[in-house]
Amino acid sequence: MKKFLIFQKKYPKFIYKSYSLNLKPPKLSFEFFYSIPQDFSFVSKFEIQNLPRKSFDREILEDLVFHLGLVEMLNYWKATFSKEIEIEARKLDQREIKFFKTLIFKGMGEYFFQNRIPLSFAKKIKIKYQSGSKKAKKVKLFPKNAILPIGGGKDSIVLAELLKDAKMKLFGFTLNPQKNQLLTLNTLPLTKKIIIKREIDPGLLKLNQAGFLNGHVPFSALLAFLSLILAYIFEAKYIAFGFERSADDPNLKYQGVFINHQWSKSFEFERLFFVFSRKFLLKDIYPFSFLRPLFEIQIGKLFALFPKYHHIFLSCNKPFKINPKVQTWCKTCPKCLFTFVILYPFLGKEVFDIFGENLFEKKELLGLAKSFLDPRVPKPFECLGTKKEIHSAFFLAQKRWNEESSNKKLPYLLNYFKNNFFLGEKQEERMSKKLLFSLGKSNIPSKFLSYLAKKLCLRS
């Protein structure tokens, strides 16, 4: 019997039992209680710091927290892939169920693929709940206020710096920040800096070690629902994400369905979340991704405009997994090579200082380079750009190397690109310009769009 069937048969039900909320400004703490009968129970804990000292409608706050718990539960449910999820914590409108089923099916596609779970089984997951009518609450939200999720990478830096030009009050938050994320948070032009602590139940980690099912969950969806809580608390009309056009690009096809590591960053998710949050939670909220029209290579181009961040940002996730105290680039993972490749055309040899060496010379990265460039090879499960823009980044890197290097011999990976994927100067120039000076579809309010277009033209 397949592994997932063994767990599903032994643990047919997962329960979202309840939640608790403790509001004592300047802190808000809440806990989610989950169980897998008969053997396991879990408590997931959150604490939001730096809250304003004011009163809140507890019913609204509880509803927002409860909905966050629906996303958080996926971290625990994935251990057994129980075929029934029972929601005891609060009533749900039957129209909400469609959203959460979509979140499970598409947001956890990578998990299904990695655990070889047939998608027909994923579609059969049942959500049992108490039905209740629901509509969004109308609350005071100011159009000058915006909530920004802040990571340690280039996207949130570009996001905040561009929105600064729009004279917005920016409320930036970071979840369980590491050293470089705190440094970024404290350097950004933010009106308010918010720290959120999250504590995963240690029992889940024990299940992972014991060989229970594990895999990717839609983390950006968790940030989206956290943002709703903060939007209510800080009276912000806008939630501005740093999700880009490249996030729509899938990694591979599994049983006839495209699997996208970044689905909860995709435009599809953004639109679903926009409609869901305005229909069922906060009537006048406006979540959108300010970087949606841009490819990753365009964001790299904009990031080059902000030198004070060049040596403090960190997009590599590997150090955090191995030793959280080590804050540096591993220089071996897909994120490191990708970031290096898209920044070199705009920063040149400064990238060598950022990474500590020239990654184009590392022969051991050839396999990664192939997965980036070869259309026949699946793209790694990471937050990366499209193969087309990585191709153009390699071309622009080759061009810059030839322009500024006294050593005309191309480094190993650039030479590999030239010998295997180079399409000729004219075609490469045409392709790269098309990528660098285009804007894709978005849900950006029109008053913000001009700031994006203007900044892109500064380095044309």
Predicted ranges, named:
Residues 1-145, 157, 162-182, 186-203, ...:
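RNA-binding accessory domains that recognize and position tRNA/RNA substrates
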Residues 2-32, 283, 290, 304-460:
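ATP/NTP-dependent adenylation/nucleotidyl-transfer catalytic domains that generate, transfer
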Residues 53, 173-311, 315:
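ATP-dependent adenylate-handling ligase core
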Residues 157-161, 221-229, 301, 335-342:
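Contiguous, well-ordered alpha-helical segments that form the cores/surfaces of helical PPI scaffolds
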Residues 76-87, 114, 231-239, 344-354, ...:
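Short helix-capping/linker segments at secondary-structure and domain boundaries
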